[in-house]
């Protein structure tokens, strides 16, 4: 093989390690006033659950959704009658509508269709995943017929739901957010997450790493001097380990490692496979053919897993499970651990790696912070404790809310909130980035665990005489040959004047912004000719046109959701008003005793007619329900006015007292 000097030509592309393209992020980071930015929210966009928080009045509020829950399922569903459901409502109808209930999109976003993990996962999804230019798309039957959705579109719907939850609580419109991603997400996954925010109508001011956000939640009020913190973040679908030093508000990530395809969903799947095999052995029937049965099992297995964090044995009971037969089996904690022990043990490898990368020993770690719902599993806690020679992990933060908490603090800093302290956040890129040089060699420009933002340049040259063009191929990964690493993209630098090999000087610059998004530039120092890439040309990226179309689709869905809600509200108002009148007329001690027989009959006829109309026009539009209520009020109101005048009181405003009465009656 030819010897090569630091000069030979190569190809560089955009790098895959940090994904959000944030032009001018450093300004965002600056002292923007609240008047410019407004309130910024922090969103933990999780595989299985999402959470939103806001920093105000000197503290973080984690915001509950309309069901009173502080975490919201990352589920989207399309019902047979054309309604779109997001969150709890979507997850609650999974077993009755499995093919059109979409979840786990965080495991698809930013990945190619032929990715091994995607091919593994789609075997277990009840919904259909198709190949669109080697990008996974999800098929669903919507009110407008069958639709194909990019993972970014589904994530955008979840982000919109989290924004709606915040807007309802804050009573104002929100346009800016900090969104978290796994530390081990690559550039494509980060950029796709940023795109999802754009589709949702959110300006994602910053993408921050989940374990870093959790460290902020843990250490914001810690003032005891420098400490080494290890964050062990095992969630529903991803796993990260980050080692940080915290020193009076300065959070510096020293090293990070993880697995973007390991979490509670995998533990559930192992248990499901166990019960599917057991059922086949006992009954001779394969339930995999029935999506509803599989999703019923999924629901019960998740419940059982949670219960086994405190109990040692649980029983799973499912009525009419398959072919009309019930399901009843027990699961012990020991069996659950046996089914997943290799996965549990695999979490120790990244722990070992971050310590090695930081050149620290287990005894150098001052605090272990457990984050993510899966860290409630006793065996996981035991393995972590044993690895650190019996050291107890910190119990000070809520593992479900810590990431959103940290994101909300960062959001508070960006929006100029007071009392966020002198917070300084120094994060790192998780994977080495470089370009391919002669012979398929990976020439590294930015090593993993380099503090970001960062910029690094190196001079390369041509590999052949009179070579007019060089191709810059950008890779991420730790292997010495590019074939073993991940290609992020490539671009050409053309117009190089004829010259012997090794003479032209081509400067390649890698620049990673605060979001971990990579920009690669190549410049011919002789001519000043320049080209660059920010991953836009990668086939896995959405084009600006795609994003614009998806924004319009998202707005259309929001309008449709609003119309559905208006219809439901109008129907409920009419129904509530009619039944309230019916109940009051039937009450012989109240209104029923005060009305003349003639007036009573008049109202009764009108109410019965309205109820009958409701039964036969359940799918009417909101205007029709409102008109019917106005019509009913037109009959009732003069009678009520006459009644009040006879008793010497003022008449109630049009129908309001009765409808308020109705609401009180129904409490």
Swiss-Prot record:
It catalyses: ATP + H2O = ADP + phosphate + H(+). It is an enzyme of class 3 (hydrolase). A motif (Prevents secretion from ER) lies at residues 664-667. Keywords: ATP-binding, Chaperone, Endoplasmic reticulum, Hydrolase, Nucleotide-binding, Signal. The keyword ATP-binding applies. Its main location: endoplasmic reticulum. One of its GO terms (cellular component) is endoplasmic reticulum lumen. Its EC number is 3.6.4.10. The chaperone activity is regulated by ATP-induced allosteric coupling of the nucleotide-binding (NBD) and substrate-binding (SBD) domains. In the ADP-bound and nucleotide-free (apo) states, the two domains have little interaction. In contrast, in the ATP-bound state the two domains are tightly coupled, which results in drastically accelerated kinetics in both binding and release of polypeptide substrates. J domain-containing co-chaperones stimulate the ATPase activity and are required for efficient substrate recognition. Residues 135-289 are annotated as: Nucleotide-binding (NBD). Probably plays a role in facilitating the assembly of multimeric protein complexes inside the ER. Is required for secretory polypeptide translocation. May physically associate with SEC63 protein in the endoplasmic reticulum and this interaction may be regulated by ATP hydrolysis. This is Endoplasmic reticulum chaperone BiP.
